Each structure stands twice: as structure tokens, then as C-alpha cells.
Amino acid sequence: MKRTMFSLTLLLILSVALSGCSIVGSRISHALGDEENYIMNEEIITEKVESIDIDWRVGKVAITPWNGEDIVVKEKSDTTLTSRTKMRVRNQDGNLTVEDTAKGVWLLPLLFKKDLEVMVPVGVDLRIVDVKATSSSVYISELSVMDVNIESTSGDIVLDEMKVVGNTSLKSASGKIDADMKAGVTFKAETASGSINTSVSESLTSLDAKSASGSLSIAVKDTERI
């Protein structure tokens, strides 16, 4: 009897949560009135940006250089994007924040994932890059940054040809960490389940790498202090 009541309750919750949703094949998408639907969403930042703060739920996160003049923020999804599920982007006092709004909607993050790409003009020096990801792999390449802080609950972290003048902190609860970079002051990498492979400059004053279940590979480059 208790099992029957639990099943009925679960079905009722799901029916309420999915009301107002359209089902196409095996995909579910929210439709809000006559709102235009998107698969790709893009924001162009023309003002000066000194730091980037990303909070993402599910999908890949990439920060890469490009030859344009402005920072471009793009999200991609194989499921319809609406005002409830599109990212929230704001640039205030040089601090660019990108938030995955779907993370605040119950059940919605379980239905689809979105990939995020932030394209930074070549030659732009950033003060801070801070990324918090839940079920996302994070990839950052060829950027010059003062400090980097990346934290992922479940996903790989990859830094490729990075120049970090100050402090680097990389943490993944479940995922590998690969870092090829010039690091200025401190470097810290930690993963509970996954390998750590890093190549850093010898100018570091502190290096800390920990893996509860995985291999460690640390190479020190013979480079001048940044």
C-alpha cells in the first residue's frame, strides 16, 4: 500500500512539473506562450571586462581567445531555450558574470544540458577568472590572468598554454586535471577521483597537488619569472 501511494505521489509530482512542456521525440522543451525559441543564444560585451565569474550547471564550459574586438558569450543547447532557461549575463564595473539560470528550476537541469563558450579578444589581460561548475568539464586556453579559481563537482579541468601571474586553484570532486601553464606565485590542484597532470614554471613559490584516487604527474619548466 505504501509503495502504491509513493508511486502515485511521484507520478503526480512529475505531471505537475512537466505541465506546460512540449515533448518532441525523446526531448522535452519548455514553451512559454508565443515566445521565440532558440537553440543558440549569444551575448556581445562591448564594455571593458577585468574579471569573469561563471556559475554553470550541466554541460561544457570553454574560455578561449579569438581575433575579434569584443568578448562574446555563447550558449548552445540541443533543446529549446526560453527566458527561463537562457543564461543570465551581466557586466558591472568590469566584472562579467555568467549564470546558468536553469540551475534554479526544479527538475529542469535533469532534462537537458547546455554548453558555454566565452571568447576573449587576443591580448586582453584579465584580473580574475572564477568558474564554479556542477556537472561540467572546464577548458581554458591561451589567456593571461592574474588569478584563476576553478571548481567542478563532476568534470575535467583543462588549462592549456595559460599565463597566470598570481595564484591558481583547481579543484574537482570527480574528474582529471590537466594544466600546461606559466604560473607566477602559487599552484594548487586537488581531485578526489582522477589524475593530475601539470606542467608549470619553476618560478612558483608554492605547489600543492593532491589526488585521493588517481595518478600525479608534475613537470617543472625552466622559464623566467612572469
Region spans (language model):
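Acidic (Asp/Glu) and glycine-rich low-complexity loops/linkers
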Residues: M5-L8, G20-W56, K60-A133, Y139-E151, ...
